[in-house]
UniProtKB/Swiss-Prot annotation:
Any matching Pfam family: Peptidase_S24
Subunit details: Homodimer.
Protein EC: 3.4.21.88
Protein name: LexA repressor
Molecular-function GO term, any one: serine-type endopeptidase activity
InterPro entries, per the entry: ArsR-like_HTH, LexA, LexA-like, LexA/Signal_pep-like_sf, LexA_DNA-bd_dom, LexA_repressor, Peptidase_S24_LexA, Peptidase_S24_S26A/B/C
Reaction catalysis annotation: Hydrolysis of Ala-|-Gly bond in repressor LexA
List of catalytic residues: 129 (for autocatalytic cleavage activity), 167 (for autocatalytic cleavage activity)
SUPFAM superfamilies cross-referenced by the UniProt entry: LexA/Signal peptidase (SSF51306), Winged helix' DNA-binding domain (SSF46785)
Function: Represses a number of genes involved in the response to DNA damage (SOS response), including recA and lexA. In the presence of single-stranded DNA, RecA interacts with LexA causing an autocatalytic cleavage which disrupts the DNA-binding part of LexA, leading to derepression of the SOS regulon and eventually DNA repair.
Amino acid sequence: MTKLSKRQQMIFDFIKSEVKLKGYPPSVREIAVAVGLASSSTVHGHLERLENKGYIRRDPTKPRAIEIIDLEMEQQLPKDEARYAPVIGKVTAGIPITAVENIEEFVPIPSSSAGPDDNVFVLVIDGESMIEAGILDGDMVIVKQQNTAVNGEIVVAMTEENEATVKRFFKEENRIRLQPENATMEPLFYDNVTILGKVIGLYRNIH
């Protein structure tokens, strides 16, 4: 790979640290603040050069869609720092679909993403209702199994129609609001939902 300038290296290191810490890449604004740049267009220019040099891959149609090319999941997790979680069916982040409760495969996740006694599973996102939270169509979300949630948390919820969906959870005075992270989509309202777990991370294959 072509050598990076000092500023490009700062941006690349920040993106890597955010992906490792949060499971998804930072926004252009967050990058600008982190490395001391005032202009979003300057950040875009550096990202373009990082892409041309083979360090990242971007999808211009999706926000936050920055993939670190050298961060293949298998490579970034040393054997003693990884655990394996089952991929259970598929959950739609858009139009809910009935959850399929069978294990399709196992994938490595960071041991630091959950405690040793936590039950975790992975679900595949099908849809674009959470793109503004950095959760894209085809991503695998890492979910800590629990039956409670705090307002504002991203959860996997089973609706009254026994369909599962990934949304941001809000308990209001007399209803539950499941809020998409997509300005083009409306919230969903229910008298009651069953919380299956809280999203604690994200697994993204790099193709």
